[in-house]
Amino acid sequence: MSQWSLSQLLSSLHEDIQQRLSVVRKTFGHPGTKGDASENVWIDMLDTYLPKRYQAAKAHVVDSLGNFSQQIDVVVFDRQYSPFIFTYENETIIPAESVYAVFEAKQTADAGLVAYAQEKVASVRRLHRTSLPIPHAGGTYPAKPLIPILGGLLTFESEWSPALGPSMDKALNANLTEGRLDIGCVAAHGHFFYDQASGAYSYTNENKPATAFLFKLIAQLQFSGTVPMIDVEAYGQWLTK
């Protein structure tokens, strides 16, 4: 009688992601098409394996003051408590309060891409976010503190050798403020994350990077808790303008 193998199941998850990214790299010649296909691989993985309270999409993020982020390759956002998500001509617009994490997704990591990803992440973190007191039977709970928005980078390969070595560390440490990248994956090599306790990046070279990254992301999202109660009327004021 055959038996299940958890090790094989976890390995298969990574192998599927790596194989799909590899096919994209080899098959599509147009950079734009290749980029879109790479984003779709990561979005599909997150939508499949993250708890259903989360959803992933390529999107812009907007705040109640009318400010927009740059276009973000992969946004992980709340779908359970978000009162509205705009979709117009296949473009998705997500309120800033609903965002848990944002990622830049490309085929290959290099210094330019890391800096570009940091600016993309900063464009989301700079947005204004509201948080309302929460009503209950006996009154109201204080407004929930805003959760940190995770920023990250998702690629198949790296221009550096070693892929997760000093060159990547230098690029990541160039921006540890609004643009800080908290977590990322180079699917052919390993994953990384920013360790708050040590104030430094941790790098892991491994055989199943996509799976390890997914588990680490889920763990970080668990610590994020739930997004705050959005002030819908702050957005509604734009109906009169």
From Swiss-Prot:
Enzyme Commission identifier(s): 3.1.-.-
Annotated control of activity: Activated by cAAA and to a lesser extent cAA; both cyclic nucleotides are products of its cognate CD-NTase. Cyclic nucleotide binding causes hexamerization.
Coiled-coil intervals: none
Cofactor: Mg(2+)
Gate loop latch, annotated site positions: 136, 141
Residues of the site described as Binds cAAA: 53, 81, 226
Record comment regarding domains: Second messenger binding causes a series of shifts that enclose the cAAA molecule.
Function: Effector DNase of a CBASS antivirus system. CBASS (cyclic oligonucleotide-based antiphage signaling system) provides immunity against bacteriophage. The CD-NTase protein synthesizes cyclic nucleotides in response to infection; these serve as specific second messenger signals. The signals activate a diverse range of effectors, leading to bacterial cell death and thus abortive phage infection. A type III-C(AAA) CBASS system.
Official protein name in the record: Endodeoxyribonuclease NucC
Gene name for this UniProt entry: nucC
